[in-house]
């Protein structure tokens, strides 16, 4: 039996009956909606054939407009024309004003400090604005598909936190949409290219949009995408290319006046048109404000070279964070309209040492990946391809010192999924670690279910806390759990596979969840006590080693004070008084501060011996 033999949410009882699903790319600058028809994923256009919907809403007393009509009001009615609302999602008002001090909106704070935007339609929060954009996309899809949507997959940046993800879900619910899943944007792009069923390894997703740049480093393993690292620049995008080119045209045309909004708009429009033309041509003629001239691709490249270099620096940082070399990357996926610029593609190819994937329209690739996922989740695939599992019914984790359970993947997490957590050694010179995989909701290992045990050997003999072991949990679409432990400095690893709920009935799962609720308060107290006892043992172990090595640094009186504090800690650690143990730990820390300082000075002197100041 797999985790839970359940159908996906809302799965059709009649397998032959096709259900309507859509993938939505809810973007900062533009949004799209896509679906799968006749086996092909495609984005859906409006009545005028435009696939992009500007993520802009214009509010009036008697209603609102979304998209191109709203964007046209931006200059005349700035305060009531809300754009880039994605930047505000899940953030407090203080955070927004700190990050984006030049936003042209009037804000008020709600009772819990969340932003409320003053508009002609009243006070609105970012969730409501996002909901209006989602409604417009859903209406486009319903009209195109001649029916109401049964479910949607909405994409979000990989770096979105829980609050931002929940805000996106709330907006969808407000728009009357059933969210099948939130999907990371880089994962959606990889799915669009079919990389989820391709060769396992590292994939880079380079996303250069109008206003932001994001780089994501993913690892594909057993059909699961794990986000290794993300990075980017929230103040760098294709709009910056446009403004640089507009300034260059202004300089060439000899236009000194910057106060004329009409001329400003004309210059920017000319720059955008020239940028687009230079993606295919080497030279473009520009006619603006009575000036005519030519701009070459080489001139444009010179203008934007520094900005492109900034994106590559962010790529380098993300690779470093992921502990991956550029040559290890199997594929580079290009996302965002600005990746059409030839210099961008050229520099990215040089950086990663391979030709980036550009066959799918970079504006549409995320929405297409979301549509493919939505089509699966809504139940339109044949049984042989159907995902029978949607969520993990019980949390998965590890037993740690003191008999505690550290949850790595919480229950109700959608699968497939991969999560990693770092652990360290408890004792000096420890060269092996026992990995005990647990399942359940309780705080103590004795109250959870043991799934598997394995050992990681060959850990470098370092002081306690010196070794870093990354433990990765992966659950694939069939509910198969793989746990891998790797010591980061040597790369040695060990792993095991297990079916997490083999042998558990639905009623047993429900009982385990119920117990976790019934014993919640008792479990928290037990965990706090166990944590303090573990910390006490760690402190005493460390102190014993320090005294063995450097007792000569202490006077007899100082040694006696430390011994007394340690003896008291050892005594109270045998009891059940959490506060007493905590105070005893603090007392040991206080009594040993001078000792620790002397040991540090001695270590520094030893390290400097025989070296000049210049060498240091």
UniProtKB/Swiss-Prot annotation:
Any one Gene Ontology molecular-function term assigned to this protein's record: ATP hydrolysis activity
Pfam families documented for this protein: HSP70 (PF00012)
CDD domains: ASKHA_NBD_HSP70_HscA (cd10236)
GO biological process: iron-sulfur cluster assembly
InterPro entries, per the entry: ATPase_NBD, Heat_shock_70_CS, HscA_NBD, HSP70_C_sf, HSP70_peptide-bd_sf, Hsp_70_fam, ISC_FeS_clus_asmbl_HscA
KW Repeat (keyword) present: no
Superkingdom of this protein's organism: Bacteria
Keyword Nucleotide-binding in annotation: yes
Keywords, sorted A to Z: ATP-binding, Chaperone, Nucleotide-binding
Function: Chaperone involved in the maturation of iron-sulfur cluster-containing proteins. Has a low intrinsic ATPase activity which is markedly stimulated by HscB. Involved in the maturation of IscU.
Family matches, as HAMAP family: HscA (MF_00679)
Homology family: Belongs to the heat shock protein 70 family.
Protein name listed in UniProt: Chaperone protein HscA
Biological classification of the source: Bacteria, Pseudomonadati, Pseudomonadota, Gammaproteobacteria, Enterobacterales
